[in-house]
Amino acid sequence: MARSGLDRIDISPQPAKKIARVGGLQHPFVKTDINTINVEHHFIDTLQKTSPNMDCRGMTAGIFIRLSHMYKILTTLESPNDVTYTTPGSTNALFFKTSTQPQEPHPEELASKLTQDDIKRILLTIESETRGQGDNAIWTLLRRNLITASTLKWSVSGPVIPPQWFYHHNTTDTYGDAAAMAFGKTNEPAARAIVEALFIDPADIRTPDHLTPEATTKFFNFDMLNTKSPSLLVGTPRIGTYECGLLIDVRTGLIGASLDVLVCDRDPLTGTLNPHPAETDISFFEIKCRAKYLFDPDDKNNPLGRTYTTLINRPTMANLRDFLYTIKNPCVSFFGPSANPSTREALITDHVEWKRLGFKGGRALTELDAHHLGLNRTISSRVWVFNDPDIQKGTITTIAWATGDTALQIPVFANPRHANFKQIAVQTYVLSGYFPALKLRPFLVTFIGRVRRPHEVGVPLRVDTQAAAIYEYNWPTIPPHCAVPVIAVLTPIEVDVPRVTKILKDTGNNAITSALRSLRWDNLHPAVEEESVDCANGTTSLLRATEKPLL
């Protein structure tokens, strides 16, 4: 199989001037001056030059505007300031399967040349090349001017896209305070290791890459992670086995999503997502690390430490509930059978055994939230509790519940009103555009950890489970800088993909059409002043139509 034009990554800390492999994408996995590229200016310029009435051959203008914009960024990276970040000609090879293209393609030109299969091939290559996410400078560049799954706002009437979304650099998430976000960023590798060791079904992993009779290489994508993994084929050990890059909505080109953990086969040559014919579903996981439960196990005055000790000594559902309910605002919110859940927590329950004194219900549900509440109400979560680590062996194990099982089913499910659910719904929508025939299985992972004791500091902890043995030479490990795992909760989520698809597709297309008409009018009438919304801080000001907001 021929390799794509962008199938290699250089992880050298210094920008590479010499191209190691012909046809390969080269860029350092560090913050560099490529971030100074005026992404916003070019994107708005592309919008201004695009007719709202362009012929898209049954597709939408937004996707071709996005592709034209990405083409400009990638070709700019081929030679900025005499330093090569991507292979000269690789962008044309990716877009047009040729090394030459006379000039930057206009969206209408792309609409006349690219098929739906071409678009998916290009965007799947971009996803593969942007794994590493925040450590990947290209991920950061391409994510600008996108409405992302983690930043899209929702109102009672549905998703809300600001009128001037094209001015907004969507580079940071907006959920939670800075301390909570820092805790999540620090401990996400620990949660990822737990997902790999406990949550991923071995049946999802042991799937052959090559099913065709002419295939000569027979191995499994995830069997030999240090020798034949697609992660190494793209050149960086910092890319995890199930890591996902930037997925751009193939329907509108407006929305982007980067999944925390994606279990899907990849092409062994290019690293692009490539489910084999035997796959019927794709699992992905959104990780949330709960900073508000962080505690010192040796602090006798901390009630979390006391309830944690009780839970470890007597692992029952009642003691688990007591631990979770120890803090003022627990991660599980109770609502009565006749009440509605509030928006406070991502996990909810209406089970009488989980009733909490002083609970407050929420306002009336939107029709979509009520629908998703019905879909998820009968779903249960599974919980794993961890023993204290064995420092001599460098391992950590899960406790056995009274039933003898390592996981406990609890009557807790996802809250459709919470921002985490909305984020996962958007991720599901974006991923479904690439693989419409496959069942998508999203999960919310809740990680709770504790402070390390002095003798535990600096010790990596291998997650010692039977399932983890399939990883052989790359056993899932809690990095030494992470908290010691205490509890992990796995919550399946059911999303009505057709309904969410219609809502988000219509919203995205309307936002694109509105932007095209607005900017085209501004371009033709530069002296007109109008009220403009600064999406960065929500303020309103009068701006000349030819000026951009100061972000």
Swiss-Prot record:
What InterPro entries does this protein's entry cite? Answer: Herpes_alk_exo, PDDEXK-like_dom_sf, Restrct_endonuc-II-like, Viral_alk_exo
Superkingdom of this protein's organism: Viruses
Location(s) in or outside the cell: Host nucleus; Host cytoplasm
Any single GO molecular-function term of the entry would be: exonuclease activity
Give the enzyme's EC designation. Answer: 3.1.-.-
| Keyword flag ATP-binding | no
Which family is it part of? Belongs to the herpesviridae alkaline nuclease family.
UniProt KW keywords: Endonuclease, Exonuclease, Host cytoplasm, Host nucleus, Host-virus interaction, Hydrolase, Nuclease
The kind of enzyme this is, by top-level EC class, is hydrolase
Task: Indicate whether Nuclease appears among the record's keywords.
Answer: yes
Q: Which Gene Ontology terms of cellular component type are present?
A: host cell cytoplasm; host cell nucleus
Stated name of the protein: Alkaline nuclease
**Complex and partners:** Interacts with major DNA-binding protein; this interaction increases the nuclease processivity of the alkaline exonuclease.
**Major subcellular location class:** host cell
Q: Where is this site: Required for function?
A: E188, D260, E286, K288
Q: Which Pfam families match?
A: Viral_alk_exo
| Role this protein plays | Plays a role in processing non linear or branched viral DNA intermediates in order to promote the production of mature packaged unit-length linear progeny viral DNA molecules. Exhibits endonuclease and exonuclease activities and accepts both double-stranded and single-stranded DNA as substrate. Exonuclease digestion of DNA is in the 5'-> 3' direction and the products are 5'-monophosphate nucleosides. Additionally, forms a recombinase with the major DNA-binding protein, which displays strand exchange activity.
